[in-house]
Amino acid sequence: MSGSSNVENLSPQIIRQVAKEVLDLANHPPEGVKVFPNEQDITDVQATIEGPGGTPYEGGQFKIKLSLGKDFPQTPPKGFFLTKIFHPNVAKNGEICVNTLKKDWKADLGLKHILLTIKCLLIYPNPESALNEEAGKLLLEQYDNYSERARMMTEIHAKPTTKTAPTKNEETNCPSTSGTQSTSEGPMAKKHAGDKNAAEKKKKEKKRALRRL
């Protein structure tokens, strides 16, 4: 994830464009997203995404970063979760796999679209492009185990010290791309209702087991 800044490689026009968009997002963020401008390096865009309600990530605060390359916006930025998460489309090093940041990228999509796509990835994981094969396999074959594992990782690594209201699961806000499912189909959507009734009695035991992950 580490790397030098690419600010010197970007044109003044692109620098102004990115700076303006980041400032606009910081002042008028999408629901469930907070953007933190980095005045020293605008190619390092950091944000926090609230875990959407009705998912195993509910109540979590997930820090992410977008690293803009020297050819941005002709090439997509790289996205990373800085907060540990159990998710099919997030690698162990935090790298995010979503088609919007790969084959479906378009130079005019903008940072807001990327952030909303990543948020919707928490609602609709895509096991077909899994970077975490274990999570993808569990999502498809043993959803209850997947949900419990993801929920406990959220509890350990993403829960803030002070509780905040969970973000509403607003499906209509999800960008329509092939990298995310934007309908109520799929294994994740079908199980949302049961996620809120997780067994609390196993929580302490699972926490101890997962702290070494």
Swiss-Prot record:
<dbReference type="GO" id="GO:0031145">
    <property type="term" value="P:anaphase-promoting complex-dependent catabolic process"/>
</dbReference>
<feature type="active site" description="Glycyl thioester intermediate">
    <location>
        <position position="97"/>
    </location>
</feature>
<dbReference type="GO" id="GO:0005634">
    <property type="term" value="C:nucleus"/>
</dbReference>
<dbReference type="GO" id="GO:0000209">
    <property type="term" value="P:protein polyubiquitination"/>
</dbReference>
<feature type="compositionally biased region" description="Basic residues">
    <location>
        <begin position="203"/>
        <end position="213"/>
    </location>
</feature>
<keyword id="KW-0132">Cell division</keyword>
<protein>
    <recommendedName>
        <fullName>Ubiquitin-conjugating enzyme E2 S</fullName>
        <ecNumber>2.3.2.23</ecNumber>
    </recommendedName>
</protein>
<keyword id="KW-0131">Cell cycle</keyword>
<dbReference type="GO" id="GO:0010994">
    <property type="term" value="P:free ubiquitin chain polymerization"/>
</dbReference>
<dbReference type="GO" id="GO:0051301">
    <property type="term" value="P:cell division"/>
</dbReference>
<dbReference type="Pfam" id="PF00179">
    <property type="entry name" value="UQ_con"/>
</dbReference>
<dbReference type="InterPro" id="IPR023313">
    <property type="entry name" value="UBQ-conjugating_AS"/>
</dbReference>
<feature type="region of interest" description="Disordered">
    <location>
        <begin position="157"/>
        <end position="213"/>
    </location>
</feature>
<comment type="function">
    <text>Catalyzes the covalent attachment of ubiquitin to other proteins. Acts as an essential factor of the anaphase promoting complex/cyclosome (APC/C), a cell cycle-regulated ubiquitin ligase that controls progression through mitosis. Acts by specifically elongating polyubiquitin chains initiated by the E2 enzyme UBCH10 on APC/C substrates, enhancing the degradation of APC/C substrates by the proteasome and promoting mitotic exit.</text>
</comment>
<dbReference type="InterPro" id="IPR016135">
    <property type="entry name" value="UBQ-conjugating_enzyme/RWD"/>
</dbReference>
<dbReference type="GO" id="GO:0005680">
    <property type="term" value="C:anaphase-promoting complex"/>
</dbReference>
<dbReference type="GO" id="GO:0070979">
    <property type="term" value="P:protein K11-linked ubiquitination"/>
</dbReference>
<dbReference type="GO" id="GO:0010458">
    <property type="term" value="P:exit from mitosis"/>
</dbReference>
<feature type="compositionally biased region" description="Basic and acidic residues">
    <location>
        <begin position="192"/>
        <end position="202"/>
    </location>
</feature>
<keyword id="KW-0547">Nucleotide-binding</keyword>
<dbReference type="InterPro" id="IPR000608">
    <property type="entry name" value="UBQ-conjugat_E2_core"/>
</dbReference>
<keyword id="KW-0833">Ubl conjugation pathway</keyword>
<dbReference type="GO" id="GO:0006511">
    <property type="term" value="P:ubiquitin-dependent protein catabolic process"/>
</dbReference>
<feature type="compositionally biased region" description="Polar residues">
    <location>
        <begin position="174"/>
        <end position="185"/>
    </location>
</feature>
<dbReference type="GO" id="GO:0061631">
    <property type="term" value="F:ubiquitin conjugating enzyme activity"/>
</dbReference>
<keyword id="KW-0067">ATP-binding</keyword>
<dbReference type="GO" id="GO:1904668">
    <property type="term" value="P:positive regulation of ubiquitin protein ligase activity"/>
</dbReference>
<dbReference type="GO" id="GO:0005524">
    <property type="term" value="F:ATP binding"/>
</dbReference>
<feature type="domain" description="UBC core">
    <location>
        <begin position="13"/>
        <end position="159"/>
    </location>
</feature>
<keyword id="KW-0808">Transferase</keyword>
<comment type="similarity">
    <text>Belongs to the ubiquitin-conjugating enzyme family.</text>
</comment>
<comment type="pathway">
    <text>Protein modification; protein ubiquitination.</text>
</comment>
<dbReference type="InterPro" id="IPR050113">
    <property type="entry name" value="Ub_conjugating_enzyme"/>
</dbReference>
